[in-house]
UniProtKB/Swiss-Prot annotation:
A single Gene Ontology CC term: cytoplasm
Compositionally skewed regions (Basic and acidic residues) per UniProt: 231-248
Gene Ontology molecular functions: arginine-tRNA ligase activity; ATP binding
Assembly and interaction partners: Monomer.
Protein name as it appears in the record: Arginine--tRNA ligase
Amino acid sequence: MSPEALQELIFTIANNLVSEGKAGTLTAEELPDSAKFAVMRPKDRAHGDWASNAAMQLAKKAGMKPRDLAQLFADALNGTDGIAAVEVAGPGFINITLDSASAAAVVDQVLDEGNRFGKNNHLSGKTLNLEFVSANPTGPIHIGGTRWAAVGDSMARILQANGATVVREYYFNDHGEQINRFAKSLVAAAHDEPTPVDGYKGAYIDEIARRVIVEANAEGIDILNLPRVDGGTDEKGEPLGEGDSEQREEFRKRAVPMMFDEIRQSMKEFRVHFDVWFHENSLYEDGEVEKAIADLRNAGDIYEKDGATWFESTEHGDDKDRVIIKSDGTYAYFAADIAYYRNKRHRKTDPADVAIYMLGADHHGYIGRMMAMCAAFGDKPGENMQILIGQMVNVMKDGKPVRMSKRAGNIVTIDDLIDAIGVDASRYSLARTDYNSPVDIDLNLLASHSNDNPVYYVQYAHARSCNVDRNAEAAQINAADADLSLLDTEADGEVIAALAQWPALLTLAGDLRAPHRIAHYLEDLAAAYHKWYNVERVVPMPLTEAEERADEQTRERTRIAKNPEPARAAARLKLNDAVQTVIAEGLDLLGVTAPDKM
């Protein structure tokens, strides 16, 4: 019997108590849905397999003492098939002990459903646009963006496992001053000149500059001798703006796509998939910025002041109004944000019911204006727009911070991390900590094959379970018709209970946008499995020389422990395979492989 089945049973009993007039002043309308009745695993096994606080939840509305109401629940639960014992404890907890067959039923459920176990339609009917990473195309993905890649892709997988339609989106900031600074840096590097004060530096700038020169020369363009003074036209024949030059424009139009390609390749190597690669520049080229401003103007949220155009965001909860067109006629950065949100909500293909933005800690000040813009379009902040803020990543090696990249100068990049510890360890370590908290990445630990390394610990549980399968096959153990009621030891119960908690945990991780909960669950399941593996045998094992020399009573006890009867071995093999299934599913949600050997 699963925790979800117990929730439904408790809900049914609550309804029956109300209809029979036994629940005091409680009415049917005041009952929460079944999912609101918490069923928890007690920390002390003496308190049963599962505990519920339903009586304490309802006692006030019922006008009853919690323990008295809890006793009514206990009386109704006693005698239910699959329940061995029920008792009331403490202020009104209902402690439930299952019989071994009922508890172990989840094992067959896992094996029947395979990697569908725990997946649900909780979020079906909703399209969630999940935008993450979205680093400027002016350099390699840095460690902060790498965290968002791991967290964002894992979150997308978890939301899909809960039935949502998820659009993974990357927003290329390819319009604005940062692109001009990138181009200026390339020109300076190409001429072996100092990096501009506001420019980008690092070996990658030299690499890109060389690639641009080679590409241009192959097309018969002597790019280094193009005019470097202001003036001229871009590739579309439009006049170049102030501070631009033909040479800088040639570097820009060639280098930005190169960075796009490099970013795409990095994401592919990191096992991160995007459905949409959206270019900021398209918002201007397609007139969407003007349309968005027009919509806000029609709604009365735009005014003119000091020669600039302002969004009256204070009317929607922001701390101050925001300029969207500067007095010189150029657009403020926020203008594109407005148009982009409007595009997400109203595009023809997969318009977003919920637009989720994953932003770095340096964007915390953007929340107010973004939510105000959402409200100005008639949407609900927090519902149609959700903003997640991630914290810093500190990379450590030999107990000291790693701050330098061979290629990118003063930042650590996604490629640096992959080279140091691989994709699996990188993704897992970045996803296992709540993105609201800073995270330390210990390169020494994550490269080690030890139980202190969390990704190794979980992957080793999967590999170990696969080895059990191989040994069981060699020993001709057949689990097809296993009697799961034989899974009656304390170690069996801990593993079974961990498996039973997976569906609720997966739902919670989706609701809370919390991939780290998946990682923590996997570590708990792996811990229960490793402990079980060390005390419960599946495949018969010969006694060691030391065990053979023990006294007769000890020797016989060890022989029995290491040579289970066939029926019990078959039941344990099923439990082993159920653990293997759930660990593989959980690792896949985090974008991490589940090896069969280590």
